[in-house]
Amino acid sequence: MKNMLLMSGSKYKDTAYLVHTLPWLAQFLADYKGKKVAFVPYAGVRRSFDEYETTVQNALQSLELEIVSVHRGKQHRDIIEQADVIAIGGGNTFCLLKQMYEHDLLDAIRAKVNSGTPYFGWSAGANVAGSSIMTTNDMPITYPPSFNALNLFPHQINPHFISGKMQGHNGESREERLEEFLIVNPQSLVYAMPEGTALHIQGEQATVLGAQDILCFSEKMQLDTKAVNSTFNY
């Protein structure tokens, strides 16, 4: 059974890196102390893989996990195949997916997660768990072989969702951008995840975690609000 924790971002309000996720992760990984976590660092454009690995190791030290970046393997997918848990960090979703294709990780991750290996990711790491990355917020744009992602959660995800416009901002709001996506892709569902929220996926059910509701948009911006602590079939 799939077991995934998809988190909107690495920070919430003024909290330090990944601090707000620790209670969720402690419960999610309660049975995995001392186990090996394969970490995928490809989204980290402004830091090296070594730096990203160390940052995550330090942030999650209290969970007592063995966190190993996939770049430590002779073949990156070797680390995935040896792991007890898979984690994908945030950053640039285009760079992340491009390198996941280059290192042949998608099928390996998909097979492991469908067989029950826990998966957690934040921001870009949540985005690639969805059907495609076409509702990412990111620049720079690099070109992966396809925008199709892991499809472990078979819908679109939009992390860091903010409703409305800032004063003086004359570009599109997030709702307007998602409306345009749904005009072009009317069969899609988009799960808009505000800061400080997460989806805990267990099999074919999802539970909303955090301090805010998650918004599900469909054709013509029909809204289905997923309330905090609610569980739904997807």
UniProtKB/Swiss-Prot annotation:
InterPro entries listed in its UniProt record = Class_I_gatase-like (IPR029062), Peptidase_S51 (IPR005320), Peptidase_S51_dipeptidase-E (IPR023172)
Q: Where in the cell is it found?
A: Cytoplasm
User: What Pfam families would the database entry show?
Assistant: Peptidase_S51 (PF03575)
Q: Which residues form a coiled coil?
A: none
User: What are the catalytic residues?
Assistant: 123, 138, 160
Q: Name one GO biological process term.
A: proteolysis
What is one term from the GO cellular component aspect held by the record? cytoplasm
**Keywords from the UniProt entry:** Cytoplasm, Dipeptidase, Hydrolase, Protease, Serine protease
| One of the record's GO molecular function terms | serine-type peptidase activity
Q: Which SUPFAM superfamilies match?
A: Class I glutamine amidotransferase-like (SSF52317)
Q: Tell me its EC number(s), please.
A: 3.4.13.21
- Name the reaction it catalyses: Dipeptidase E catalyzes the hydrolysis of dipeptides Asp-|-Xaa. It does not act on peptides with N-terminal Glu, Asn or Gln, nor does it cleave isoaspartyl peptides
Q: Family assignment?
A: Belongs to the peptidase S51 family.
Record function comment: Hydrolyzes dipeptides containing N-terminal aspartate residues. May play a role in allowing the cell to use peptide aspartate to spare carbon otherwise required for the synthesis of the aspartate family of amino acids.
Annotated protein name in UniProt: Peptidase E
- Gene that this polypeptide is encoded by: pepE
